[in-house]
């Protein structure tokens, strides 16, 4: 009989969002009349920007003409898209990022997991707690951890607690680690990182030969000009960081699938024989072997993000969700709840009322208000007693959900 990857058996029962779906579906079947509003999973609701739609329609027409037809594209992505990303997202902010260092993919979630293919099995890995579950689960799947304890913490990972006491920004560890996952604006807490804070992490990584895996999927929601959008705005980051970005939230590409990862040339890791090896070459080899690239049609849609029309439309889209976040913040605060995030991020992080666990509050919100959020404990042990509310929904649904919560007096 064929053997399996036993590391999958170490995963906690049910990925967070499928477990939420299971509970919601069970409630819906028992209460078919309930008008459930979903503010849980971070999926967008508003239509694709017109500029992106028009570009994809034209790309479909291209595929119907022999002279414009495209077959397999470059595994790294088309140069015309990578060049626009480099110029607009990085060089315009003073970041030394070349188009050749950008790899187009079908999602930053995929890249955050796939990047582990180029790293060894003996690295000391640091994650915040709470944390986006993908960072932890993909390391478990890859065999980088031991078993989970009663708190759901895996042996072999270094957990860095984030809480209201440290403004939801982890303290730099006193011990040496090799891989560091940072996500800003943060999922799930909505916290942001100052330039000084990121500089401290870069200094630590360079001093310890560590690599920062920087998830900037929500950078478009930053409105404070003092907050960096990229780790590469920080001096020295090219020597110690890889950055993940996505078109999912700023341009509504969750169902269209397009993202990118920046691996600086010159960034190095250590081989078993002690020699230093450039990570760009390893990632390029990995992508060329395991990935056939994002479709031409989708990449044309992503390229349109950088047109004048596209820029105006995605700014409008981001502003729409940020206004939702403002409404959620203000209404939950008025309801007597302790609220964080939701200013430079699309997520609001709420302290559960006294005596309620995260899942207790989930069930109460679902049953009493017919509103779905995400239990903080699903993001890690330190998330217990918190709850994430997403701003990704229609204005009508957000307003209705907040009215229900205020009327229920859940605080």
Swiss-Prot record:
CDD domains in UniProt: AAT_like
EC supergroup of this enzyme: transferase
Cofactor: pyridoxal 5'-phosphate
GO biological process, one term: lysine biosynthetic process via diaminopimelate, diaminopimelate-aminotransferase pathway
Domain of life, per lineage: Bacteria
Pfam families found in the cross-reference section: Aminotran_1_2
Binding site for substrate: 15, 42, 109, 132, 187, 292, 388
Residue numbers carrying N6-(pyridoxal phosphate)lysine: 249
Keywords, ordered alphabetically: Aminotransferase, Pyridoxal phosphate, Transferase
Reactions catalysed: (2S,6S)-2,6-diaminopimelate + 2-oxoglutarate = (S)-2,3,4,5-tetrahydrodipicolinate + L-glutamate + H2O + H(+)
Biochemical pathway: Amino-acid biosynthesis; L-lysine biosynthesis via DAP pathway; LL-2,6-diaminopimelate from (S)-tetrahydrodipicolinate (aminotransferase route): step 1/1
Binding site for pyridoxal 5'-phosphate: 72, 108-109, 132, 187, 218, 246-248, 257, 292
The protein's Enzyme Commission number: 2.6.1.83
Molecular-function annotations in GO: L,L-diaminopimelate aminotransferase activity; pyridoxal phosphate binding
Protein role: Involved in the synthesis of meso-diaminopimelate (m-DAP or DL-DAP), required for both lysine and peptidoglycan biosynthesis. Catalyzes the direct conversion of tetrahydrodipicolinate to LL-diaminopimelate.
Family statement drawn from the similarity comment of this UniProt entry: Belongs to the class-I pyridoxal-phosphate-dependent aminotransferase family. LL-diaminopimelate aminotransferase subfamily.
Oligomer and partners: Homodimer.
Cross-referenced HAMAP family: DapL_aminotrans_1
Name of this protein: LL-diaminopimelate aminotransferase
